[in-house]
Amino acid sequence: MKVLQEKILNEGKVLSGDVLKVDAFLNHQIDPVLMQEIGKEFAKRFKEENITKIVTIESSGIAPSVMAALELGVKVIFARKRKSLTLQDNMYVANVYSFTKQETNEISLSRNHIDENDRVLIIDDFLANGQAALGLMSLVEQAGASIAGIGIVIEKAFQDGGKKLREQGVRVESLAEIASLDNGTVTFVQQETAEVK
């Protein structure tokens, strides 16, 4: 997605060979126009999948998920990382290790909002080692719902998360695939199909 790649190049900051900071438009400050375009792109890619619900994880996955849900006409349910006084019982639970925060979180979804009749699109901001996506898949599978695919805003293709998910037969659609963050420079995976001008 060209507009996203341009945003990453112009406003993203490479902090190391593994870490890209995109807090200027995605995971702290949010660019709503960009999120709207991201939502439209996810909806376009998954429009034939009969999605009934989008599942994401708090908090950075919420904005792109809501925009995609608006386009698809479905609801969003986000996995919580912290226990809530109002959501204590009747939960699906999974453990997820965060590479960025170097900690394991117990994530949960209420059983009241997802069931075996749902066809789910999972959306997240980043895909690196795949732990968040695997945790979300576990929650969806515990509910008996089917997974239509996973939409990722930015995939670090040089890490093994995407490979792990695809090897399990999961459809993964990434809007920006990064081949490398070496030497403080973002290098994107070359698309196999050239854009028609």
UniProtKB/Swiss-Prot annotation:
CDD domains: PRTases_typeI. Pathway: Purine metabolism; XMP biosynthesis via salvage pathway; XMP from xanthine: step 1/1. One of its GO terms (cellular component) is cytoplasm. GO terms for biological process: purine ribonucleoside salvage; xanthine metabolic process; XMP salvage. Its EC number is 2.4.2.22. InterPro entries: PRibTrfase_dom (IPR000836), PRTase-like (IPR029057), Pur/Pyrimidine_PRTase (IPR050118), Xanthine_PRibTrfase (IPR010079). GO terms for molecular function: xanthine phosphoribosyltransferase activity. Xanthine binds at L20, N27, K156. SUPFAM superfamilies: PRTase-like (SSF53271). Keywords: Cytoplasm, Glycosyltransferase, Purine salvage, Transferase. It catalyses: XMP + diphosphate = xanthine + 5-phospho-alpha-D-ribose 1-diphosphate. It is found in: Cytoplasm. Transmembrane segments: none annotated. 5-phospho-alpha-D-ribose 1-diphosphate binds at A128, N129, G130, Q131, A132. Converts the preformed base xanthine, a product of nucleic acid breakdown, to xanthosine 5'-monophosphate (XMP), so it can be reused for RNA or DNA synthesis. Belongs to the purine/pyrimidine phosphoribosyltransferase family. Xpt subfamily. Homodimer. This is Xanthine phosphoribosyltransferase. It comes from Bacillus cereus (strain B4264).
